[in-house]
From Swiss-Prot:
This is Thymidylate synthase. The gene is thyA. The active site is at 146 (nucleophile). NCBIfam families: PRK01827.1-3, PRK01827.1-5, thym_sym. InterPro entries: Thymidate_synth/dCMP_Mease (IPR045097), Thymidate_synth/dCMP_Mease_dom (IPR023451), Thymidate_synth/dCMP_Mease_sf (IPR036926), Thymidylate_synthase (IPR000398), Thymidylate_synthase_AS (IPR020940). (6R)-5,10-methylene-5,6,7,8-tetrahydrofolate binds at residues 51, 169, 263. It comes from Halalkalibacterium halodurans (strain ATCC BAA-125 / DSM 18197 / FERM 7344 / JCM 9153 / C-125). GO terms for cellular component: cytosol. Homodimer.
Length: 264
C-alpha cells in the first residue's frame, strides 16, 4: 500500500493548516488521486491493523438500503454510533441514496440495481454512476456523504471503479474507503461475470486531523507488507445475496493497530 503512504507523505509535506467543522483542525490538500490494480492483491492497509469486520458489515448495510444502525450494532460494528439519534436513525444517508433515491416527482430510484444491470447489458455506457449526494436531503442527514459519487468502467472484460471523495480523513477514514470500494468492485465484477480491474480513488479535500499527525508519522516508519487476497464465495450470483460469511481475507499480516480519536 505504498500509494496510501505516499498520500500521507504528500499531505504532511504540502498540506496547509485549516479549520474545520469539527473544531479539531487539519492539514489539507485539494485534489489528489491514487490507483490500485485489484489483480495485484486486495488493497488493505498493512502499516496498521484494520477492523475488516466493520468494513464488510458497513458495505452490506449500505447495500441493504438501511439507515438505522441496528444491523451494525447487532454485528459488533460501532463506527456510526456517534452520529445516530436516540433511535439509531441517521436520516437519508448512503443506503437510502444508493437504493431508494427520491426524485422531485416522488419516484424512487434503486441506483445500485440500475448500475449492475447497465454493466451487464450496456458495458460501454458512460452513465455507470451512483451518487450519494442528494442536495435536497443533505440537511436531513446526520453526516453529509464524504464518499459521494462513484463510476464504473468496463474494458477488456475487466471492471474498474473510480470514487470521488469530497472529504477524506486520511488516517481513520481513507483506509476503510479504499477497502470498501475495492470490495464492492470485486462483488459487482463477480455477479457481472467480469474480472476486477482498477480502483481509482480521487479526492477533493484530503486531510490529516491535527490529533492524528503522530499516528500518521508512526505509520510512515513501518514497512508495508505484501497485500492479502480477498476471496469471495463463487456461488453468489446476486449482489444482494452476499453475507459476511461469503468473504475470506487470506494472508493479511498487518502491523499492530494504531488508535486515533474520531472527530464528529
Amino acid at each position: 500500500m505504498e500509494q496510501y503512504l505516499e498520500l500521507c507523505r504528500h499531505v504532511l509535506e504540502h498540506g496547509t493548516e485549516r479549520s474545520d467543522r469539527t473544531g479539531t483542525g487539519t492539514i489539507s490538500v485539494f485534489g489528489y488521486q491514487m490507483r490500485f490494480d485489484l489483480q495485484e492483491g486486495f488493497p488493505v492497509v498493512t502499516t496498521k491493523k484494520l477492523h475488516l469486520r466493520s468494513i464488510i458489515h458497513e458495505l452490506l448495510w449500505f447495500l441493504k438500503g438501511e439507515t438505522n444502525i441496528a444491523y451494525l450494532q447487532e454485528n459488533g460494528v460501532r463506527i456510526w454510533n456517534e452520529w445516530a439519534d436516540e433511535n439509531g436513525e441517521l436520516g437519508p444517508v448512503y443506503g437510502k441514496q444508493w437504493r431508494s433515491w427520491e426524485g422531485a416527482n416522488g419516484k424512487t430510484v434503486d441506483q445500485i440495481s440500475q448500475v449492475v444491470e447497465a454493466i451487464k447489458h450496456q458495458p460501454d455506457s458512460r452513465r455507470l454512476i451512483v451518487s450519494a449526494w442528494n442536495a435536497a436531503e443533505i440537511e436531513d442527514m446526520a453526516l453529509a456523504p464524504c464518499h459521494c459519487l462513484f463510476q464504473f468502467y468496463v474494458q477488456d472484460g475487466k471492471l474498474s471503479c473510480q470514487l470521488y471523495q469530497r472529504s477524506a480523513d486520511i488516517f481513520l477514514g481513507v483506509p476503510f474507503n479504499i477497502a470498501s470500494y475495492a470490495l464492492l468492485t470485486k462483488m459487482i465484477a463477480q455477479v457481472c461475470d467480469l474480472e476486477e480491474g482498477e480502483f481509482v480513488h480521487t479526492f477533493g479535500d484530503a486531510h490529516i486531523y491535527l490529533n492524528h499527525i503522530e499516528q500518521v508519522k508512526l505509520q510512515l516508519t513501518r514497512e508495508p507488507r505484501p497485500l492479502p487476497e480477498m476471496r469471495l464465495n463463487p456461488e453468489v450470483r446476486s449482489l444482494f445475496d452476499f453475507t459476511f460469511d461469503d468473504f475470506e481475507l487470506v494472508g493479511y499480516d498487518p502491523h499492530p493497530h494504531i488508535k486515533g480519536e474520531v472527530s464528529v
